[in-house]
Amino acid sequence: MIVGAGYFEDSHDQSLMAGSLIHDSNQAPASSENTSIDLQKFKVHPYSTEALSNTANLAEAARAINHLQHQLEIDLEQEVPPVETANWDPAICTIPDHIINHQFSEDPQNILVEQQIQQYDSALYPNGVYTPAPDLLNLMQCTMAPAFPATTSVFGDTTLNGTNYLDLNGELTGVAAVPDSGSGLMFASDSALQLGYHGTQSHLIKDICHSLPQNYGLFPSEDERDVIIGVGSGDLFQEIDDRQFDSVLECRRGKGEFGKGKGKANFATERERREQLNVKFRTLRMLFPNPTKNDRASIVGDAIEYIDELNRTVKELKILVEQKRHGNNRRKVLKLDQEAAADGESSSMRPVRDDQDNQLHGAIRSSWVQRRSKECHVDVRIVDDEVNIKLTEKKKANSLLHAAKVLDEFQLELIHVVGGIIGDHHIFMFNTKVSEGSAVYACAVAKKLLQAVDVQHQALDIFN
């Protein structure tokens, strides 16, 4: 509360204020009679319970208060209008001058402030007209005792870090940081720091903000913090893909290009590789006579079985070629022997014939073929001149009849037949022998049996 050319501060002796807080004028101290304030200039209108309960009086009072506030905001230099002092209680509404003078005389700093205020009043109002109290915050010099010794480096000693990252251009004065072993860093202010407003604002914050892109924070995110290294040495950004970045924006743009380029390349390469593998697997499956499933594991299994079958077929064909050649040579030798016996001469070709027979007897023809279809499974094995056939199919009528027709086409001599039923399937086993002079191959027998059984099943399905 400020009255006249002085000020009141509640931090001083409270005993001096006792007289000003008593509501009864008879109990006021005698020193209040010597006040220099003209009490006749003030008037406080009396209020009663009936007046407060009246709505019209309350509205009128509110309008008066609003008008007064409006006038105070427009012209602070306007003189306070005279009021009536009939009901004025000086013990409640005034502060004696000797109390104010006593408070000012206690502190030298307050004396200095009073002198400045008086100079300010005399400069503004040379005629001595009453003026409101000036703004003391712009005139006072607040001295603040530092909590810690003032330092000149931030984040530790300059000899340790070598760089003050808060005071990059030496524009922040009076601010320092003191290392604390318990909680990291603690900031302290220098006593020379003034609380007044400086018109020339530092360009440090402006430069930092303008150097960053829009909607980009001052502190990087976690993935961008990972590339920050060498805080003490001054190297702020790590090399990515053998590239050095000098700013946050360049590092962000470089990281984006680095990640996008490699990510797209890797994704495209992986996708192309999978497509190539799928094409190769489909092509491989088309080579099989009877593929089972479309998955890669089944295709690989079918490929292994088919390769083994081809190897057995190659060996079988080689043996058949040798047997046919040996048969032709043998017939020629027999013909020569017969001609020599008719002439009474011994033949010198017999030892050679015996050697060739021994070599051919050591090589036995063998082949094994398996074929599958939706309704049937065929297993054909040939050992020398014997053919063993196993046929498994679902229960259908006349299955044995169609299998016998196929055996008759290949001129196979039927030796033994076994049949049975397991669940919903018929199982037949045929033991046959290859006739002399006939060429029988396991793959041909299996293929013919499958075709005959499948045609039968298709005909039955159409008929049903």
UniProtKB/Swiss-Prot annotation:
SMART domains listed in its UniProt record: HLH (SM00353)
Molecular function in Gene Ontology: protein dimerization activity
Family of the protein in this entry: Belongs to the bHLH protein family.
CDD domains registered for this protein in UniProt: bHLH_AtMYC1_like
Domain called bHLH: residue spans: 261-310
Protein's GO biological process: anther wall tapetum development; pollen development; positive regulation of programmed cell death; regulation of DNA-templated transcription
Gene3D superfamilies: Helix-loop-helix DNA-binding domain
Location of the region described as Helix-loop-helix motif in the Swiss-Prot/TrEMBL record: 275-310
GO cellular component, one term: nucleus
Keywords, ordered alphabetically: Developmental protein, Nucleus, Transcription, Transcription regulation
Function: Transcription factor involved in the regulation of tapetum programmed cell death (PCD) and degradation during male reproductive development. Interacts with TDR and promote tapetal PCD by regulating the expression of RTS, and the two lipid-transfer proteins C4 and C6, which function in microspore development. Acts downstream from and interacts with TDR in the regulation of tapetal PCD. Regulates directly the aspartic protease AP25 and AP37 during tapetal PCD. May not target the cysteine protease CP1.
Location relative to the cell: Nucleus
Protein name per the record: Transcription factor EAT1
PANTHER family membership: TRANSCRIPTION FACTOR BHLH91, TRANSCRIPTION FACTOR EAT1
Region (Basic motif): 261-274
Null allele phenotype: Male sterility due to failure of tapetum programmed cell death (PCD) and degeneration required for pollen maturation. Male sterility due to delayed tapetal PCD and aborted pollen development.
Region Disordered, residue ranges: 338-357
Organism name: Oryza sativa subsp. japonica (Rice)
Membrane spanning residue stretches: none
Assembly, per entry: Interacts with TDR.
